[in-house]
């Protein structure tokens, strides 16, 4: 009895080893889980459900196998793939979740989210996030020809990489007060997120008690998952 969480795979045609590792994970690990939660940035970029990349169809087909086996798969949007929509969700058998969701797993309440909204010290990114999550702007972008969307996404990615090189590691990490605020808002003691690529399980001082903040690692040289059972929350890394 276990529920699995992953994030920040950044799947792309340029990283076939990561794709192969993810497919093995689905076939050998996720297939035995009670449920799979993907907490954003499954793909390195997403410019619309109408993008005909073969990789998207491959991943959708493999995820749909879980659906056919009766294993639910849930998805929280990341900062790279926030445009994944109902069409791809239906193709893959995934259920799209809100930015923040509280789960009741084995008798414990857990807040899950991608994690970028916790990085409140990065003011420039938060302003950018508000713009690109505007439904009107998203609709306009998705009305553009696919070729135009490809160019815009590439330019935005290049700009983001340049800006991140100038930022301190502290700015790009979560803000402690933001973490406390979300835990208290939802009245939970456990949070699971990705985004920062800094895998760890942190103890959080809530004043009257202690909580946990479990952070998923990115899939670069190895895979990363969090396994929640009735007895434990475990951060696990594994080779592709």
Curated annotation (Swiss-Prot):
GO terms for cellular component: cytoplasm; extrinsic component of plasma membrane. Keywords: Cell inner membrane, Cell membrane, Hydrolase, Lipid A biosynthesis, Lipid biosynthesis, Lipid metabolism, Manganese, Membrane, Metal-binding. The lineage of its organism: Bacteria, Pseudomonadati, Pseudomonadota, Gammaproteobacteria, Enterobacterales. Coiled coil: none annotated. It catalyses: UDP-2-N,3-O-bis[(3R)-3-hydroxytetradecanoyl]-alpha-D-glucosamine + H2O = 2-N,3-O-bis[(3R)-3-hydroxytetradecanoyl]-alpha-D-glucosaminyl 1-phosphate + UMP + 2 H(+). Pathway: Glycolipid biosynthesis; lipid IV(A) biosynthesis; lipid IV(A) from (3R)-3-hydroxytetradecanoyl-[acyl-carrier-protein] and UDP-N-acetyl-alpha-D-glucosamine: step 4/6. It is an enzyme of class 3 (hydrolase). Mn(2+) 2 binds at residues 41, 79, 114, 195. Substrate binds at residues 79-80, 122, 160, 164, 167, 195. It comes from Pectobacterium carotovorum subsp. carotovorum (strain PC1). PANTHER family: UDP-2,3-DIACYLGLUCOSAMINE HYDROLASE, UDP-2,3-DIACYLGLUCOSAMINE HYDROLASE-RELATED. Binds 2 Mn(2+) ions per subunit in a binuclear metal center. This is UDP-2,3-diacylglucosamine hydrolase. It is a peripheral membrane protein. It comes from the Bacteria. CDD domains: MPP_YbbF-LpxH. It is found in: Cell inner membrane. The keyword Cell inner membrane applies. Its EC number is 3.6.1.54.
């Amino acid at each position: 009895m276990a529920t699995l969480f992953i994030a920040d795979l950044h799947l792309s045609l340029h990283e076939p080893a990561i794709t192969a590792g993810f497919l093995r994970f689905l076939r050998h690990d996720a297939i035995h889980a009670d449920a799979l939660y993907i907490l954003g940035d499954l793909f390195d970029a997403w410019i619309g459900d109408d993008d005909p990349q073969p990789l998207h169809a491959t991943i959708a087909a493999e995820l749909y196998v879980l659906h056919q086996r009766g294993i639910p798969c849930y998805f929280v949007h990341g900062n790279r793939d926030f445009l994944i929509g109902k069409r791809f969700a239906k193709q893959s058998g995934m259920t799209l979740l809100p930015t923040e969701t509280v789960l009741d797993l084995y008798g414990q309440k857990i807040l899950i989210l991608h994690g970028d909204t916790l990085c409140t010290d990065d003011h420039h990114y938060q302003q950018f996030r508000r713009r690109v999550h505007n439904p009107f702007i998203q609709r306009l972008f998705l009305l553009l020809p696919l070729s135009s969307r490809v160019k815009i996404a590439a330019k935005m990615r290049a700009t983001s990489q340049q800006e991140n090189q100038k930022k301190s590691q502290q700015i790009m990490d979560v803000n402690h007060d933001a973490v406390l605020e979300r835990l208290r808002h939802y009245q939970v003691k456990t949070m699971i997120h990705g985004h920062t690529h800094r895998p760890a399980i942190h103890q959080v001082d809530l004043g009257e008690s202690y909580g946990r903040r479990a952070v998923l690692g990115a899939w670069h040289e190895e895979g990363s998952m969090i396994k929640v059972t009735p007895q434990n929350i475990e951060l696990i890394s594994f080779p592709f």
